[in-house]
Amino acid sequence: MTNTKYYPEVSSNADFATIEKEILKFWQDNNIFQKSIDIREGDAEFIFYDGPPFANGLPHYGHLLTGFIKDVYARYQTVRGKKVERRFGWDCHGLPAEMQSEKELGISGHLAITNFGIEKFNAHCRDSVMKYAGEWEQYVTRQARWVDFKNSYKTMDKNFMESVLWAFKELYNKGLLYESMRVMPYSWACETPLSNFETRLDNSYRERADKAVTVSFVLCHPVSKSTLDVIPWLDHGIQKTINNDSANCSMDPVDKPRYDTENFLGITANYKEYRILAWTTTTWTLPSNLALAVGSDIDYALVPKGDVCYIIAASSVSKYAKELELKGDEQFTIIKGSELQGLSYKPLFDYFKNHPNSFKIFAGDFVVEGDGTGVVHMAPGFGEDDQILCESKGIKLVCPVDNSGKFTKEIPDLEGLQVFDANDKIIIKLKEQGNWLKTEQYIHNYPHCWRTDTPLIYKAVPSWYVKVTEFKDRMVELNQQINWIPTHVKDNLFGKWLENARDWSISRNRFWGTPLPVWKSDDPKYPRIDVYGSIEELEKDFGVKITDLHRPFIDELTRANPDDPTGKSTMRRIEDVFDCWFESGSMPYGQAHYPFENKQWFEEHFPADFIVEYSAQTRGWFYTLMVLSTALFDRPPFLNCICHGVILDATGQKLSKRLNNYADPLELFDKYGSDALRVTMLSSNVVKGQELLIDKDGKMVFDTLRLFIKPIWNAYHFFTMYVNADHIKGELNFTSENVLDVYILSKLKIAVEKIKESLDSFDTGTAYHAVSEFFEVLNNWYIRRSRARFWKSEKDADKQSAYNTLYTCLETMAIAMSSLVPLISEAIYLGLYCHPRKSGDPEKPECLDSRLCGNDNLSVHLCDYPDLSKFKINSELVDTMDTVLDICSHSLFIRSSENARVRQPLSSITIISKNNDKLKSFEDLIKDEINVKSVIYRDDLENYAVKKLSINFPLLGKRLPAKMKDIIAASKKNEWEVTSGSLIICNETLNSDEYKLILEPHSHIKGASSFAHNSSLLILDLELTPELIDEGIARDIVRFIQQARKNADFAITDRILIDINLPKITDIYGEFIKEQTLGEFAKDFIPDHISEIELDNHKLQLKIKKVN
């Protein structure tokens, strides 16, 4: 007999954070991550793209969530036999870096940066952009995520940037790029336009209060026969002008008509003026007004007030009752918006009064009734719809606002004033002129800059665009090849975004980014555009060696215009740089420096098998990947994609440093470990796109530790404690004659298979549930029901089989769940495989497994996923034993409900079921587990219970709203039937998720509960005899003694002396108590431990002593 302890001493109160740190060190010291890649060399690959974060800020819980998901599937595919490279990447260019540098340098704005020096500014950006790279590596490593930092790509690297240039030229050559002056979302704080999808990122829309104004425009129109022919309703009340004063109306330089100062829209009365009312929430755009838009089919009312007639949408009249002095019983002449088309009006201001073709009313299909007056004021320099309509009518846009959002000298009254600060001054002027009618507070969702949180404006800016609208239908087609999680993203969140995709502005008038490779002639007499797609092309044309593609070095490259015979004009690069989202979308080929290098590698690694980010990236990274992949390669960029939700605080607020509503993740790791946070996040619905609320104090993570991690560890602790006490070594064994062994090994296969199916389907929630469910059965059924086998002194085949079975469960699950809880799985696996040498030196582990890796180091992450063919499953046993567990579980629930403690024996349980024959073979087990003296079997269910129909009203109501009243009435009368497994009510067949059949015991029956999915009933006899009460006390005494042993820190094998003054109980149940506690009753000994206990309101003293 050997006294070797083959396994480490494991504490039941493990410090998981410390254990995790030891495992992290083991991985680092033994290069386990790299080995996990090397051992798969030559195997099929699982292609994973790691979306690049910015490193100029610390990681937050959102980053950790994404990282956990990435790590789970990379690890899982590795143990499934795939090679998974995990190259990290960094986003380096763009606004995040520039804003940070401006802040640190104490400068702001284009002019300040230019004066500071572009070279110095970009040098600072280059240094600051990787400011927190070290911290990122610390967080990522501590969360047990394996990534290749050493070979990480950076979007600011010359090779990556050159691939971006190549992509641009490819698009240009395909005719998919154009330059245009268009209205775009514009960040005046950053002095740059934004893409339309950037306004959809990170909840950029937020509530804002603006002053909405209603202003009146004085109509005027030439008096002529042609006018009356076009607008016949004018003829009802025309008044010829007496004083035809042109100074009171504008002149149209094109048609050069002379306008009347009086208007002629009267029907039955003569009016001095006709005024049309327009409503706007952007008062600051009124100085740039050039036209008005109405809805052709909208009804407009002619509303008189004194000698002025106002025109307003009929549906909006009541909102202006006070301003228009209405009583409520007036009748108004109604005209269609189409009858207003072509009318002219007097400009509000003189700034652009001579602008060609302007100050007319047009029909716009975007004009709707609702807010406002049914009339839209048009400022084509500040509205997309405005620009499109006005340009179609020959009206060129004006844009008297500079890059910093301030009025230019074209509006001298407001020059230098920020547009939002100008609203009050404009309102004052409108009042002075008599054009103001109403100001109101308007609360609406308004887009804000995703970097500065300042409200955006819409402003016409020159930009280069990708013609996304030209191939958006193809993107929609390719999207059908992608598996989205959750599934609704494919056709809704992402699919609809693709269907409505607009051309993408990819140029930014900024500094720190990949420069657009476009050179133009500086003389419009000799126009020429050159686009470059490689460093070689640049070096050839400009004759210099290029070492840095950034500004200002690239700006200095000039050459004579080849198309200028005079030789005077010069080719100069346009100042713009790329939208950084273009670079992110270029990641698949940019990281490989394609097509200049690694062409075969890229072709073998595109598209990705898997990517993951949070749901807003359907407008960001996922979208730009899709645009560029479709345009360049006509392929989807990825095949499987998880869109997870967002992490919020316990009250539903966004996590914020300002609000101080979340803890530093490292503090949480040091307290509970990272596996606990991984499980908390990935077992929730946040992986399926929903929100996860997490408390600052980490209670949720602690609960995960207690309810998920601890049960796993408890099973491992139990095994090592007992197997070391017996000096036995566990072995893998998938067969046994013992019914409990066969059952748990069958459940093991089911769990391992479920984990595999779930992770193959990118469903971590179900995978974690399978782990938790298995350990629940392992701990609370298999181990507990097998305790006698582990406790007995004989080291027979049955004991060895029990150890082998438990060992097999632990090792197999350690591998199967290694991606889900990588650190704890590793700790358990190493404990099972790296045993102390027989010499007893615990400092020199010996690997006893045949799957040795270099330097004799093992890791669970170097294993293959468990081979399911090794398992045998007894389905009939599983079904029956699961029913037994169900009976026991419901019995415990009844005891709890009736305050009948578990250790109190009961006389009987009655089981009413059609499957009693299978249950009878487990009768002794049921009696022992439920703590009853007998089991009574019956099959006449109808005498004890009735089946009731419970309908899922919200779900069924959506499908059958018209029949719900009849269905509710029929269900209350039990007028339904089950035919061939289908439930029919009111001639409708219900789906399985639309109802439940509940077994309801008759009202006079106590201690009853349904089980086996409401198909059977059990009844506990809760009446107690004096004998049953005494036996319950004996069982309580056993519990008290076991707790005293634990408190005294006795080993599980220590025999003890017991002294308790309860002769009536010890005389009858003494042998039972001694057997259960390894004790003997004695008096007059010096105790090692004394406990005060309470039984039936009597206080007793319990003394125990360890026997040498």
Curated annotation (Swiss-Prot):
Organism: Rickettsia bellii (strain RML369-C)
Described purpose of this protein according to its UniProt entry: Catalyzes the attachment of isoleucine to tRNA(Ile). As IleRS can inadvertently accommodate and process structurally similar amino acids such as valine, to avoid such errors it has two additional distinct tRNA(Ile)-dependent editing activities. One activity is designated as 'pretransfer' editing and involves the hydrolysis of activated Val-AMP. The other activity is designated 'posttransfer' editing and involves deacylation of mischarged Val-tRNA(Ile).
Chain segments annotated as coiled-coil in the UniProt record: none
Record protein name field: Isoleucine--tRNA ligase
Pfam families attached to this UniProt entry: Anticodon_1 (PF08264), DUF5915 (PF19302), tRNA-synt_1 (PF00133)
Gene from which this protein is expressed: ileS
Location in or out of the cell: Cytoplasm
PROSITE patterns found in the cross-reference section: AA_TRNA_LIGASE_I
Family recorded in the similarity comment: Belongs to the class-I aminoacyl-tRNA synthetase family. IleS type 2 subfamily.
